[in-house]
Amino acid sequence: MHARKLIVVLVYILTVLVSVAVSKRYTSEKRVQNLATFKTMMRYGRGGPSPNNKENKVNIRPRADAFFLGPRYGKRSGWSPNASLVYPVSTPLCGLDEDLSCAYTGISDLYRCTPRKGESEEFTTSSN
């Protein structure tokens, strides 16, 4: 009875040791050896001067191959004063009649306009 328990415990310990060894070997193969070389990989053909071409030395600073996502990725540039406006500020919403006061109704290009100086018309509907 004790021999049977001893065999089960030994098989369990052997299984744990084999699984640890396999997982350790797997992670060591997948890990990058030197992180500095990963960040400074050079583009093809710019690895440095060759011993044959000593007279044609070109000083080119290599760029990193890796792309690092930063906080400014995809953001637009700041406001430019020369940019064209979608809605020109100089023209009023209700056309050229400046005696009207118009309010947006919630429907695209539909405004409710009222006269500013107390004229006889109560409400007019305008489409801009």
Swiss-Prot record:
Which cell locations does it reside in? Answer: Secreted
Which sequence positions carry the modification called Tyrosine amide?
Answer: Y44, Y73
GO cellular component entries: extracellular region
Write out the propeptide range(s): 26-29, 47-63, 77-128
Keywords noted in UniProt: Amidation, Cleavage on pair of basic residues, Neuropeptide, Secreted, Signal
One GO term (biological process): neuropeptide signaling pathway
Signal sequence, renumbered to the chain: 1-23
The role this protein plays is: Neuropeptides RYamide-1 and RYamide-2 are ligands for the G-protein coupled receptor RYa-R. RYamide-2 is the most potent activator of RYa-R.
**This chain belongs to which protein, by name?**
RYamide neuropeptides
